[in-house]
Every structure is written in structure tokens, then in C-alpha cells.
From Swiss-Prot:
EC id: 2.1.1.199
Species in which this protein is naturally found: Nostoc sp. (strain PCC 7120 / SAG 25.82 / UTEX 2576)
Protein name per its UniProtKB record: Ribosomal RNA small subunit methyltransferase H
Major site of localization recorded for this protein: cytoplasm
SUPFAM superfamilies linked: Putative methyltransferase TM0872, insert domain (SSF81799), S-adenosyl-L-methionine-dependent methyltransferases (SSF53335)
Subcellular locations according to the entry: Cytoplasm
InterPro entries, per the entry: RsmH (IPR002903), SAM-dep_MeTrfase_MraW_recog (IPR023397), SAM-dependent_MTases_sf (IPR029063)
Alphabetic keyword roster: Cytoplasm, Methyltransferase, rRNA processing, S-adenosyl-L-methionine, Transferase
Length: 302
């Protein structure tokens, strides 16, 4: 009997912000406070911050023009309380000691996964794009079709934690060029043993994660953000970061801990309750870490 490979293991994404109460509690949103959401997306967390206390001011940042358009619509009622900025959070010009709280939600939005032309998911046939900021030039197609076999194997292993990285890279080089997400996913599936091919998750899952990380320089951007963001906090201000896979969480954990400006408040990451996971499956893999700007540390220190 012929088996049909399982589709990618993805939560059924919704527009609900993950860990909503935990974020608001962790940031200690106060009346008249100034907050920075560097991954505004559709505006879910930003709305919660704006509604948590009166006279809150919020700067909403995103590198994706489509996300900013959606956020402007979602947050229109707050008028001049919200300032919108299109920027990658690593490139954002953080003003010194300006915010009571900074939030980053590192998850890929349902919009990106469910919009075929963006090329983030192989559930849909689409061009190999994966650019969060469509103003940039490097796409997933460039990586897959132009990088050599060793480079591909290395990124699949490093950023996708894919143990069959060499085998998959060899097949990709043999079969390329690739033009669509589904073509690539099929080639990956055909390169692995049947037990792996019909496993719990689609064999292309980790490769697609690695490609997305490389195309958007996600981990380097995260490192830069964690280095720069604390300087933008007032003494006693807090930074909250939500990650969704182990590579991100490791960087967040060590980045917050190693910052001379911060005191980590979460010994272990905050995770979703069973009730939240039932209502919002995307929250299943979310991990929230929070740190506070040290009052006695000057902003001139690195």
C-alpha cells in the first residue's frame, strides 16, 4: 500500500497574540508609559499594550510592508498614540533611554504561512521567496539554486538542525534549478529514507526553516537586537522576547543573561497554558523570556 507523506507539522495559526496576559504582566504596562513593539505584525500584542493602561504611547516596527498596512488598520482607533516605522529590528535606530518596555515576537505569522506568493510554506505551490522584507534582493531561490553543495548542507545542519543535511543537499544540487516551493519539498522528500519521509513532520520542514533563517539573516539580526535594545530602555524598563524554536531561545537566553545592562527575571521561559494551546495552537512552542534594565547601570556602558 502506498503511503502519502504527511504535510508539514504546523499549528493552525490564528490572529491571536501568543501569551497575551503574560506579556502585559511581564512588561508591567503603566499609564502614560512608552513602549516599543519591534515585530508588530498584525498588531495583536500592540493592541493589548495600548489597552492595558491609559495614555500609553507605542512605536510599532516591522520590516514587512504588508504587516505594517495590517497593523495600521488594526490600531487606527488609537490615532497619534501609535507611531509606525518600517525597519528590521536589528537596523532600527533605538533612541537612548526612551521606552518603558520593548517587545519582540519572533514567530512567523499566519499571514506569511498562508499567503502562497510569499513562499514561506510548501503547503502551497509558490515561488521560492521567503523574504520578510521584499525590498531586499536575496531570496530562497537564490540560495537553493546558486549556493554550492557544502554551503547548503552546512546551513541545513546549522539552522535547521537537519541530520540528513548532506544527503538532502546532494539531491538538491542534482535536481536544480528549482522554481517553486512544492518542487523543492518533493525533491527533499525523495532524498530521504521512507521511515523519515513518512514521519511525524514533513522532511522539508527543517530545510525550509534553515532557508528562512538564512534569507532573512534572522539569528544575526536577533543578536544585534538583543545587544542594542537594552540601551533604549529607561532604568527599570523591561524587555520581553517570545521565541519559537531552540536556536532562537538559546540566543535569547544567553543574550539577555550576558547583557551588562539587564537583570533576567525569568529563570525558565514562560510557556503557554493548556487552555491557551487549545484555543491558539500557535502558542504551543512559544517561550517568553523577560529582563529588566538595571537602574544603577549607566547607558554609556556597553
Amino acid at each position: 500500500m502506498t503511503k502519502t507523506p504527511l504535510t508539514i507539522e504546523e499549528p493552525i495559526f490564528s490572529h491571536l497574540p501568543v501569551l497575551p496576559q503574560e506579556v502585559i504582566t511581564g512588561l508591567v504596562v503603566r499609564p502614560g508609559g512608552r513602549y516599543l513593539d519591534v515585530t508588530v505584525g498584525g498588531g495583536g500584542h500592540s493592541r493589548l499594550i495600548l489597552e492595558a493602561a491609559p495614555d500609553v504611547k507605542l512605536t510599532a516596527v516591522d520590516q514587512d510592508g504588508d504587516a505594517l498596512t495590517a497593523a495600521k488598520q488594526e490600531l487606527a482607533e488609537f490615532g497619534e498614540q501609535v507611531k509606525f516605522v518600517r525597519s528590521n529590528f536589528a537596523a532600527y535606530d533605538f533612541p537612548s533611554t526612551s521606552f518603558d518596555g520593548v517587545l519582540a515576537d519572533l514567530g512567523v505569522s499566519s499571514y506569511h504561512l498562508d499567503t502562497p506568493e510569499r513562499g514561506f510554506s510548501f503547503r502551497h505551490q509558490a515561488s521560492l521567496d521567503m523574504r520578510m522584507d521584499q525590498r531586499q534582493s536575496l531570496s530562497a531561490a537564490d540560495v537553493i539554486n546558486d549556493w554550492d553543495e557544502v554551503e547548503l548542507a552546512n546551513i541545513f545542519f546549522k539552522y535547521g538542525e537537519e541530520r540528513l543535511s548532506r544527503r538532502i543537499a546532494r539531491r538538491i544540487v542534482e535536481k536544480r534549478p528549482f522554481h517553486t516551493t512544492t518542487e523543492l519539498a518533493e525533491a527533499i522528500a525523495s532524498s530521504v529514507p521512507p521511515k523519515y519521509r513518512y514521519g511525524r513532520i514533513h522532511p522539508a520542514t527543517r530545510v525550509f526553516q534553515a532557508l528562512r533563517i538564512v534569507v532573512n539573516d534572522e539569528l544575526k539580526s536577533l543578536e544585534t537586537f538583543i545587544e542594542k535594545a537594552p540601551k533604549a530602555l529607561v532604568p527599570g524598563g523591561r524587555i520581553a522576547i517570545i521565541s519559537f524554536h531552540s536556536l532562537e531561545d538559546r540566543l535569547v537566553k544567553h543574550g539577555l543573561r550576558n547583557s551588562p545592562l539587564l537583570k533576567v527575571l525569568t529563570k525558565k521561559p514562560i510557556i503557554a497554558t493548556d487552555d491557551e494551546i487549545a484555543n491558539n495552537p500557535r502558542s504551543r512552542s512559544a517561550k517568553l523570556r523577560i529582563a529588566e534594565k538595571q537602574a544603577e547601570t549607566g547607558d554609556e556602558d556597553n
